[in-house]
Design a protein with these regions (language model features):
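Short, compact, well-ordered microdomains
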Residues: 59-85
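Short acidic alpha-helix initiation/capping motifs at coil-to-helix transition points
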Residues: 44-56
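N-terminal acidic leader/helix
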Residues: 6-44
Length: 93
């Protein structure tokens, strides 16, 4: 898996998020997370994106619980893609 494939896989089902934050913004942040080789730093970046995602979804009219659930699923896809991308790097997961 390469970075472009990882970003595509993560953002494929993120229409609600890309509509309120914008596809380029979401793709940029996911790309930066995928480029980060350090697990801890990647996770911090992921958590920041998750918080921002929840805020944007709520601002866009989604209920808090629904926004948190969507962001949690999105966060899971980001984490899974990061692990697949970096599996061959010998990075401790």
């Amino acid at each position: 898996m390469n970075i472009e494939d990882a970003v595509t896989a993560v953002t494929a089902d993120a229409n609600a998020l890309t509509s309120c934050l914008g596809q380029p913004v979401v793709a940029y942040h996911v790309t930066e997370i995928m480029r980060e080789a350090d697990l801890e730093h990647a996770r911090q970046m992921q958590l920041a994106l998750m918080r921002r995602s929840i805020e944007a979804l709520v601002d866009d009219g989604l209920e808090d619980a629904a926004a948190e659930q969507f962001a949690s699923q999105f966060d899971g896809r980001v984490g899974s893609a990061w692990k697949l991308l970096h599996a061959a790097d010998g990075v401790a997961h």
